[in-house]
């Protein structure tokens, strides 16, 4: 079954219930959340996440295979500042616990940045961090995200992701998030040869590890190493390529999550595009006037 949704907010008193309600309003049947603000460590206790009511709403609205995203502040690739590395390991462990409590099986993680020390050193540090953070009996997988190669990001090639996986002792607890914008920006031609790219992924990593898809268009050309998301069909990847990926038979059971930008001139008037983009990806017809329609809705 096609599981298609977006990033939604989990906040206020409603927490998980609010996230599921927002997802349902977009016509989603899955969604992705952060368990708190992605840029800091402040977190509500698990008891305040309103999990029971959230799970009930999800069941009633056929929501499944939800995904958690780890916060950006985790950088287990940092070999320069031990305190940053330690914070990353400890915080990742607590986020895994929260993911499990929410009933999710996948927590998406940006592998890490080597902060100028070189990819080999960064990857070695990431492996060490994952070996420390992973608890053998956990049923949550860390879904390492394919990165665009901006700055000193590790995980910009399938080989780098494979290197991390191969170095981790309990790597059955690792999976991969394939981000269309990042992979395109990293230099993979998903527009003209997605099957070839998927084949390469399968040879190097194994397609059975691909557990989450981030569906985003890109504001930049292939190989730009920028990572700037565009609305579906309004970037350099284009609607046809993204529709092909969303409906790809080999990826039928993988949840597909949109992280496209809100539409509008200023912060106050910006609107979530997900209801429209999800409908468009489901029905297979691109609407070139979509952004105007969203703004005027």
Curated annotation (Swiss-Prot):
Organism whose genome encodes this protein: Listeria monocytogenes serotype 4b (strain CLIP80459)
Known role: Endonuclease IV plays a role in DNA repair. It cleaves phosphodiester bonds at apurinic or apyrimidinic (AP) sites, generating a 3'-hydroxyl group and a 5'-terminal sugar phosphate.
Gene that encodes it: nfo
Cross-referenced SMART domains: AP2Ec
EC number(s) per entry: 3.1.21.2
Residue positions binding Zn(2+) 2: 145, 179, 214, 259
Cofactor note: Binds 3 Zn(2+) ions.
Listed name of the protein: Probable endonuclease 4
GO MF terms, alphabetically ordered: deoxyribonuclease IV (phage-T4-induced) activity; DNA binding; DNA-(apurinic or apyrimidinic site) endonuclease activity; phosphoric diester hydrolase activity; zinc ion binding
PANTHER family linked: APURINIC-APYRIMIDINIC ENDONUCLEASE (PTHR21445:SF0), ENDONUCLEASE IV ENDODEOXYRIBONUCLEASE IV (PTHR21445)
BP GO terms, sorted: base-excision repair
Protein family membership: Belongs to the AP endonuclease 2 family.
NCBIfam families on file: nfo, PRK01060.1-1
Binding site for Zn(2+) 1: 69, 110, 145
Keyword match Thylakoid: no
Residues at which Zn(2+) 3 binds: 182, 227, 229
UniProt xrefs under PROSITE patterns: AP_NUCLEASE_F2_1, AP_NUCLEASE_F2_2, AP_NUCLEASE_F2_3, AP_NUCLEASE_F2_4
Cofactors that this protein relies on: Zn(2+)
